[in-house]
């Protein structure tokens, strides 16, 4: 997986999360909503931090995607999901502002936090599921 400085990984956060959730013993309708919000969040980062020459239109597209991410996850009416998503935005933007690269490693603890809210099996097990899903295996 090639990563471009200042961008999210080419790997889809939405698909990775859905693969991780697929390994859970029980289905949870919240997982689809969280995955959808992750897709919007990644679109926002990609638009805002596409690299050199980000235009005003890119910023507007990114802002709209962030708004859709927040609106989507807020449908769950569970502050824990919103808190983790907020940390994802803060940590990713902070890393980029410091000149770093946003990689899957950056997102893994946050994705695990979201998964743990759904699975209640602990952050360590949730992180293992995320890593397995990123490698193309179900958790």
Role assignments for model-derived ranges:
Residues 1-139:
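All-alpha prenyltransferase/terpene-synthase fold signal
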